[in-house]
Amino acid sequence: MTAASSAGPRPRHLLDFQDWTPERLEAVLDNADTMLQVLDRPVKKVPALQGLTVCTAFFENSTRTRTSFELAARRMSADVVSFAAGNSSVSKGESLRDTIEVLTAYKVDAYVVRHHAAGAAHLVAKYSGKPVINAGDGRRAHPTQALLDAYTIRQEYGSLEGKKVAIIGDIRHSRVARSNAELLPKLGAEVVLCGPATLLPPDLAGQPGVRLTTDPREAVRGAHAVMALRLQQERMNGGYLASLQEYADTYQVNETLMREAESGAIVLHPGPMNRDLEISTEAADGPRSRIIRQVENGQAVRMSVLYHLLVGRA
């Protein structure tokens, strides 16, 4: 479990990628290779976090991300405290600050936080004084998803330098799109965000290494990886789309659209999928698909992040 040195101060949290240098990010991805080897063993466990307690504090429902983080912590021998807002004092009106201060009094060593409000993970970092990993805050950021996406692309090509990544779908409401738009250019990739004009947030247009387009063929042309995003209808108030069928007819990631990409281009999706809406079943299950590999890689990447923040000396 090695990591690069001389890469600047080691970040205390993973809230977004603002304080993370490319060298540190590559170190996390390098260490994920080692974690994948652990997951391939008959006994999938190492003592790296033995004696430490990780709290998964999820104020918003999650199955995949929460399970992935809890398994990642346990694979490294950490104790895991699982906090669900619906069964806690939060449902009785307790503030986020009071909840975190109580949990910290229980001697929790690190937090993995998901919250419906943008910036919530920053508040947890402020009030807990412990390392915090943002597992999704509103539509703002989901850094470990972006890291596992980057890792999956790097597995395919060896590097992200000079690669084109097209992300198609509901960009406006997607923390995954925002985190990838922040991360991938740091690692040398070009990012093209594509969707209907109503679902393209203009604030991302001026970001270095990022382009916006409403034309899916333009977005995918020459791409090395194409990511489909689901329509987050639970975050929409209406008026964004004429119809779901019209959206699928234009923006669905399918074999026809993928003909515009590089011949060896891969298909990604952060999940959960709405099959035959934003992605065809053929594309989701076909030879280009790396969707299940993303899930497998997620655990290794999250193990690497936990190691890096809690015990690594990168």
Curated annotation (Swiss-Prot):
Species for this entry: Deinococcus radiodurans (strain ATCC 13939 / DSM 20539 / JCM 16871 / CCUG 27074 / LMG 4051 / NBRC 15346 / NCIMB 9279 / VKM B-1422 / R1)
Biological pathway: Pyrimidine metabolism; UMP biosynthesis via de novo pathway; (S)-dihydroorotate from bicarbonate: step 2/3
Annotated GO MF terms: amino acid binding; aspartate carbamoyltransferase activity
Keywords: Pyrimidine biosynthesis, Transferase
Catalytic activity: carbamoyl phosphate + L-aspartate = N-carbamoyl-L-aspartate + phosphate + H(+)
Protein name per the record: Aspartate carbamoyltransferase catalytic subunit
Subunit composition and interactions: Heterododecamer (2C3:3R2) of six catalytic PyrB chains organized as two trimers (C3), and six regulatory PyrI chains organized as three dimers (R2).
NCBIfam families (alphabetical): asp_carb_tr (TIGR00670), PRK00856.1 (NF002032)
Single biological process term from Gene Ontology: amino acid metabolic process
Family note: Belongs to the aspartate/ornithine carbamoyltransferase superfamily. ATCase family.
Binding positions (L-aspartate): 92, 175, 230
Described purpose of this protein according to its UniProt entry: Catalyzes the condensation of carbamoyl phosphate and aspartate to form carbamoyl aspartate and inorganic phosphate, the committed step in the de novo pyrimidine nucleotide biosynthesis pathway.
Gene: pyrB
E.C. no: 2.1.3.2
InterPro entries registered for this protein in UniProt: Asp/Orn_carbamoyltranf_P-bd, Asp/Orn_carbamoylTrfase, Asp/Orn_carbamoylTrfase_sf, Asp_carbamoyltransf, Asp_carbamoyltransf_Asp/Orn-bd
Binding positions (carbamoyl phosphate): 64-65, 114, 142, 145, 271-272
Keyword set includes Transferase: yes
